[in-house]
Swiss-Prot record:
HAMAP family assigned: Ribosomal_bL28
Gene name for this UniProt entry: rpmB
One CC-aspect GO term: ribosome
Name this protein carries in UniProt: Large ribosomal subunit protein bL28
Disulphide-bridged cysteine pairs: none
Similarity field: Belongs to the bacterial ribosomal protein bL28 family.
Species assigned in the record: Citrifermentans bemidjiense (strain ATCC BAA-1014 / DSM 16622 / JCM 12645 / Bem)
InterPro entries reported in the protein's UniProt record: Bacterial_rp_bL28, Ribosomal_bL28, Ribosomal_bL28/bL31-like_sf, Ribosomal_bL28_bact-type, Ribosomal_bL28_sf
One Gene Ontology term from the biological process aspect of the record: translation
Single annotated GO MF: structural constituent of ribosome
Key words of the record: Ribonucleoprotein, Ribosomal protein
Entry-linked Pfam families: Ribosomal_L28
């Protein structure tokens, strides 16, 4: 569970790079994960959270 947000479960997306000659190579879009110290279930833990969850207030940072 290394590249998955622990709050919303967002993970990598898969697709293709497509050139003008219509050649396709595989591509991975990874979420912007940040390792932060947050309060979860009353305890302070270091968790990986995507920036959207941090920005929208789904997680409270520990002081």
């Amino acid at each position: 569970m290394s590249r998955i947000c622990e709050i919303c479960g967002k993970g990598p997306s898969f697709g293709n790079n497509v050139s003008h000659a219509n050649n396709k190579t595989s591509k991975i879009w990874r979420p912007n994960l940040q390792k932060i110290k947050a309060v979860k279930n009353g305890t302070v833990r270091s968790i990986k959270v995507c920036t959207r969850c941090i920005r929208s207030g789904h997680v409270t940072k520990a002081l």
